[in-house]
């Protein structure tokens, strides 16, 4: 029996079949599995504007393999376009809408299985979260990464180059013509932005989790190789959907994305220096999978796993196409396996192979791009969780992106919003030796936990990247580099110490010892708490008010929880 029989079998389902016939179904179709094709086509996003054509390829392959496809769409937000204005308030909340929409369509219509087509930003984790709720066999196949851009002299560039170029222009380091050259060359094609930013980090981690096919994270969009990957994914979901019930059970989403899959995802994240946003999203995914996983587990993995692949923004000359040419994610995992427990190789994957079977023949083809385990970029992973009185519940730093010292002590310069911070940086308020504090930008305080790419890019572009640190209860773009610490929990809106800081306070961070603290006495903190009144930003948006009321803090993945 198929799940879809609930809407298509029996005399009492004649009205249901009548409606389905109106969409073009014939008698013979009611004996076939119904496959949801969860697309995220939107013309605004470079990684998504071509996904309508991708869906046609996939649907044709599904029909050719004896199943019935039903395409539906989720929404999408382009973080790059939403950056630097109040549009960014909607980015993280869109993850919840996407998850809800997947759950709604799949469960309302009792579809048997799903193939999901995400690519960028919050769309990937949102679709994964929704798929975990539905818990039917699901294959993920992303649109694919964008090719790197190049300046006229051949220097590789990407979107992060342009954001930092704005800071360089503000500082008088480059001309308007050079900035225009960056603008016109950074994004040369469709696809998810070409570095190891959030989109490509998540698309890569799906390979580690076993829910996508090999090559998902690195094969370029709009290439024949990518088209073949779409077809393979479509064929695979049909094989599963047409199999016996016991076989289908093996490939339910939660049977693939289990605790070991979550641990493998974080291990690969550490090895490849993924975006700090992966912490937020993987914590949320773990909650949907009912996997017990927390920030302390991340540090344990980080201490164990070496960083062996460095990609833009951490290494600006290397992009996803280079990782693909050097052997792809499978070669990274194969190299990690040489040290034993870095990767859990017995876990199942959606292709029916164990992870070991998937990676056993993979090899690094260019050790200048993907290093060996004996010659890592760093002996520890590319992300770390810091603790201290400023982050009692944790804060996240992308250690792979640090350009200066790994320990820093400086004086606080405090801003109650990202806009205030940008104005302060541009006006010269931020000096070498400062710690820029941007607060009331957390999940509740923002609300929506804005990305701080504009202030971090200005800091880098103005030559302060290794001279200042930045801490925030907001988050960062995957394109951020430097001593940037986000996800500070508890956030200012919850009464966290970040909200009590004052200009001139001494702040100390030590990445290697996982410390983030303000040099304040217990008495000073208690006195400030007595006087503290959190800033509550006025909101016209009904959706953002709902979000603020339900969202948890970053240490919980910023998921929504109702009473």
UniProtKB/Swiss-Prot annotation:
List cofactor names only. [2Fe-2S] cluster; Mg(2+)
* Gene Ontology molecular function: any one: 2 iron, 2 sulfur cluster binding
Q: Which residues carry this modification: N6-carboxylysine?
A: 122
Q: What is this protein called?
A: Dihydroxy-acid dehydratase
**PANTHER family xref list:** D-XYLONATE DEHYDRATASE, D-XYLONATE DEHYDRATASE YAGF-RELATED
**SUPFAM superfamilies (alphabetical):** IlvD/EDD N-terminal domain-like, LeuD/IlvD-like
Going by the UniProt record, its keywords in alphabetical order are: 2Fe-2S, Amino-acid biosynthesis, Branched-chain amino acid biosynthesis, Iron, Iron-sulfur, Lyase, Magnesium, Metal-binding
Instruction: Provide a GO CC annotation, any one.
Output: cytosol
Note on how the cofactor is bound: Binds 1 [2Fe-2S] cluster per subunit. This cluster acts as a Lewis acid cofactor.
Binding positions ([2Fe-2S] cluster)? 120, 193
List this protein's GO terms for biological process: isoleucine biosynthetic process; L-valine biosynthetic process
Q: Where does Mg(2+) bind?
A: 79, 121-122, 451
